[in-house]
Amino acid sequence: GETTCDGKKKMYEMLAEFKPVHVIELPNCQTEAGIGLYRQELIRFKEVLEKKFGTVITEDAIRCQIHNRNQILAALNRLQYVMALDPAPALGLDIVNIVYGTGFKMKIDTLAEEVNAITDKIEAEYAQGRNIGKRARILVTGSPSGGAALKVVRAIEDNGGVVVCFENCSGMKPLDPIDEDNPDVYDALARKYLNIGCSCMSPNPRRMELLDRLIDDFHVDGVVDLVLQACHTYNVETSLVRRLVKEKKG
């Protein structure tokens, strides 16, 4: 587990009563000091795994997985950017279900190839004239939108819109690559994941910067801010999203 949101932290306490739990302490600031702390937490986690499974996790092995992960991130980014086409080639619900499903794949060595094959098919069919027609283009931001929260996406698309972009944690937010040229693999991982624009960060300018760019990239007509009950920090940031959308993007 990790200490991103308060709801998770309390849940891990209860989970630890009947399951082995290791919690990574996540600094809530994107500073050099925060990165240093998070780097140490990643090393501590590595040591816990080594002890638990009686193995040695080498830096070469980590580099290999960083490379594989970057390929997956690039493939997911490419898939979601097909929705920048206007009119959109597919419903947002179809795209988010594909993205959401990749998180449950156990065989990750071929995952990037599988996602790219789906994107190739969508692009080929679009070139032949297949699309969903002109609809209001909606961006969903805020809390993760998998599981029961997908009812919001269904409501939008059942009423004539299309969700062309998911800025949130289950969409575009975590897709920046890990720096493979960084000689320190733990520093590379810490910088990649601590610099995600999550609302648990204070301050959190990266979320608004990403949102600003995605509104333009996906030719967005409207923004829906999804806030789950346990995500109070996203609730607070709603005012910042409203200000960006209404005052800057117009």
Spans of features found by a protein language model:
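A charged, amphipathic alpha-helical module
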Residues: 39, 43, 47-163, 167-175, ...
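Trp/Phe/Arg-rich N-terminal binding region typifying the photolyase-homology
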Residues: 1-59, 165, 169-170, 174-250
